[in-house]
């Protein structure tokens, strides 16, 4: 909204040889998207979620507010979910928001471990793309599938 481009990433400190707090960082990009501007800023930590890991960060403007959307938990089982934080700016601070899309029944079908969210505004509606387990989980022979819904549908599912 401010005409600037931002890069988001998570620290990989959940790796066995590192062991530290997993955080999400943001840093401004140059107008051509090639160079970094300024210093990175930690905007959110996994400790706020009660999960050991957070990943797949995305900043989304929706309803005139800025949200950080992320996946939390372990992707291979039903504890994986999509969480949100409300942010003051792309540089933080971001605070956990009371909206989570967790495993459950959605539009008459089971959704297990929803994560990997991408948000797309096509000018007419806001679409949310995520993946979910079908027929079990990683340990029980399940497969991942993509799901595309409107933001309004996802909000109804999560509440």
Report the location of each language-model feature.
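Carbohydrate-active catalytic/glycan-binding domains of CAZyme proteins
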Residues: 1-159
């Amino acid at each position: 909204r401010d005409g600037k481009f931002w890069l988001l990433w998570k620290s990989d400190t959940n790796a066995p040889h590192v062991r530290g707090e997993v955080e999400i960082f943001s840093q401004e990009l140059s107008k051509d998207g090639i160079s970094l501007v300024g210093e990175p800023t930690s905007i959110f930590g996994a400790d706020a979620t009660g999960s050991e890991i957070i990943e797949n960060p995305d900043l989304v403007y929706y309803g005139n507010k800025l949200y950080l959307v992320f996946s939390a938990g372990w992707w291979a089982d039903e504890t994986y979910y999509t969480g949100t934080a409300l942010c003051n700016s792309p540089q933080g601070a971001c605070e956990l928001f009371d909206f989570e899309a967790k495993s459950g029944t959605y539009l008459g079908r089971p959704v297990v471990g929803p994560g990997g969210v991408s948000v797309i505004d096509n000018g007419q509606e806001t679409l949310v793309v995520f993946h979910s387990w079908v027929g079990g989980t990683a340990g029980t022979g399940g497969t991942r599938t993509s799901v595309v819904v409107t933001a309004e549908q996802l909000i109804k599912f999560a509440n």
